């Protein structure tokens, strides 16, 4: 006889967290914010050419179905009735671009990932077209014209992929970020799937006006993007549609936030001036600026932080983005073989406790905030014969911390009020060496929740609080207090300053590596195109001349 189901856990809310490296599904108790069960599936990335990064949208979708099914099985093993799951929220890697056929449900091309650099020429061409106001794009979107954002990725597909061109001509194509692809598929796909996104994801496309909270025709005309490709834009917390298949059939999807905005909500940074830093594939520092857009003068982005209800106001954030954080650990493991598992880097760094003067700038995809320098490339400098893999491991962790400090300093200048502590989350925060390094380099306390899944928690909170679900209260007095671990600085401020100044020198050396100019302005191709006869005759003349000069008979 089956064990009786537990009824005391109260209403539950699920959260899909779709990231660059993995997909997870997590289930929380809406009354206590307790994480009850979860499942994770690792994802592959494809690198067809240098600087290109793609993922298979169907693999991503299948990973979501698998995570939901396995988590529900685990809940069943815990005697928890999955009918208690009242809503599902979605959190996703932002900017990553998908275009698919609405009649077949098939992707028309691989998802072009946020890290992808193929659109550099597209960006250069577009920058020449910008009207007289050089801030035309940024004033509407809060974003610089960059390879990072979705509009240029979509423009590249429209220019280069025949399948996409044909589907657009025939009115079959739909565009979206990962959230749009997942929600459309989960709510029925070709059989009535809801084509939508939320304000936080829309604000990362470079097609969305962050003041009017609508798609901007002038921007769409500038990028030559047909507006009928675009999803409907909703708030971050409302019922979008019902799941149409699987263990959670009939459960509403009622929350949607880009991953970094979800983490801001999950860290409960609802007050102006509160900030969090998420350490994942990249590093993302967001500071809540309230109901006003603050435009940075120091290389940061202005973005929509959240809009928790159809009739609720939008809140904004300043954001600094680091392209390579956790990705550097993957690179050390997969490309160099310095470590076998991600956990090895903490052990190696702890062995030496210093980089011994070695500095690592992991600008594999150029530099993001505050430089926005696509010509930069990764460098290791300060190496000696004494340098070993432990020092390089330490330098890799230190690089993440230095990049965070650069963003924090820019944010302090823009906001005018220095942060007194930094709230952190993300997979890398399990690395205690990294967290202590971060406190040392910032010289302020770093505060980490014991429950690190704040991105999932934010998506669950938005879903549970939606009108028509209402199982999660976002009133300040009702919010669950997360238990925190605190890391205090353990070095003198002068030492921190010296190390940071040396890092800045290394950053300067990383810039300008990628250039369309040949060395010395010459054309090296001429040296590979000499006629064979000329080469032989000239070589004989030089040989005879050399023998004559040396006095050889």
UniProtKB/Swiss-Prot annotation:
Gene3D superfamilies: 3.30.420.40. Its main location: mitochondrion. Pathway: Polyol metabolism; glycerol degradation via glycerol kinase pathway; sn-glycerol 3-phosphate from glycerol: step 1/1. The chain crosses the membrane at residues 526-546. Its EC number is 2.7.1.30. Key enzyme in the regulation of glycerol uptake and metabolism. Essential for male fertility and sperm mitochondrial sheath formation. Required for proper arrangement of crescent-like mitochondria to form the mitochondrial sheath during spermatogenesis. Can induce mitochondrial clustering through interactions with PLD6 and up-regulation of phosphatidic acid synthesis in the mitochondria. Interacts with ARMC12. Interacts with PLD6. Belongs to the FGGY kinase family. This is Glycerol kinase 2.
């Amino acid at each position: 006889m089956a064990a009786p189901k537990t009824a005391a856990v109260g209403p539950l809310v699920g959260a899909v967290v779709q990231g660059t490296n993995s997909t997870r599904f997590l289930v929380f108790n809406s009354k206590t914010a307790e994480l009850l069960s979860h499942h994770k599936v690792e994802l592959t990335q494809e690198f067809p050419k240098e600087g290109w990064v793609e993922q298979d949208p169907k693999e991503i979708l299948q990973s979501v179905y698998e995570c939901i099914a396995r988590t529900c099985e685990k809940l069943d093993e815990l005697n928890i009735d999955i009918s208690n799951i009242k809503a599902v929220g979605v959190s996703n890697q932002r900017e990553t671009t998908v275009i698919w056929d609405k009649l077949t449900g098939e992707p028309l091309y691989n998802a072009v990932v946020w890290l992808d650099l193929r659109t550099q020429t597209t960006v250069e061409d577009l920058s020449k077209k910008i009207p007289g106001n050089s801030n035309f794009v940024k004033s509407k979107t809060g974003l610089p014209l960059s390879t990072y954002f979705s509009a240029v990725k979509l423009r590249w597909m429209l220019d280069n992929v025949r399948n996409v061109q044909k589907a657009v001509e025939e009115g079959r194509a739909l565009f979206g970020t990962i959230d749009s692809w997942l929600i459309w598929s989960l709510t029925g796909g070709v059989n009535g799937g809801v084509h939508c996104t939320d304000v936080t994801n829309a604000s990362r496309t470079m097609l969305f006006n962050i003041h009017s909270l609508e798609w901007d025709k002038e921007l769409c005309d500038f990028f030559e993007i047909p507006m009928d490709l675009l999803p409907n834009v909703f708030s971050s917390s409302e019922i979008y549609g019902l799941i149409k298949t699987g263990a959670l059939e009939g459960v509403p999807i009622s929350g949607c936030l880009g991953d970094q905005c979800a983490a801001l909500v999950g860290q409960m940074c609802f007050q102006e001036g509160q900030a969090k830093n998420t350490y994942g594939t990249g590093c993302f520092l967001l500071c809540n600026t309230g109901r006003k857009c603050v435009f940075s003068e120091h290389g940061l982005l202005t973005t929509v932080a959240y809009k928790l209800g159809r009739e609720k106001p939008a809140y904004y954030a300043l954001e600094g983005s680091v392209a390579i954080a956790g990705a550097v650990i993957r690179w050390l493991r997969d490309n160099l073989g310095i470590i076998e598992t991600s956990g090895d880097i903490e052990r190696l760094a702890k062995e030496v406790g210093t980089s011994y003067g070695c500095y690592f700038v992991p600008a594999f995809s150029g530099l993001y905030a505050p430089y926005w320098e696509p010509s930069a490339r990764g460098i290791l400098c300060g190496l000696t014969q004494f340098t070993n893999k432990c020092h390089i491991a330490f330098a890799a962790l230190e690089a993440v911390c230095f990049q965070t400090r650069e963003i924090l300093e820019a944010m302090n200048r823009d906001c005018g009020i220095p942060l007194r502590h930094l709230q952190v989350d993300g997979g890398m925060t399990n690395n205690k060496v990294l967290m202590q390094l971060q406190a040392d380099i910032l010289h302020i306390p770093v505060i980490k929740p014991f429950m690190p899944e704040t991105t999932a928690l934010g998506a669950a909170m938005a879903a549970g609080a939606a009108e028509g679900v209402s199982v999660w209260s976002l009133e300040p007095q009702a919010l669950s207090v997360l238990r925190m671990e605190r890391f205090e600085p353990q070095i003198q401020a002068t030492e921190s300053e010296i190390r940071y100044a040396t890092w800045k020198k290394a950053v300067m050396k990383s810039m300008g590596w990628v250039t369309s100019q040949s060395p010395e302005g010459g054309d090296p191709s001429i040296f590979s195109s000499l006629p064979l006869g000329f080469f032989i005759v000239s070589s004989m003349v030089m040989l005879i001349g050399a023998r004559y000069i040396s006095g050889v008979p």
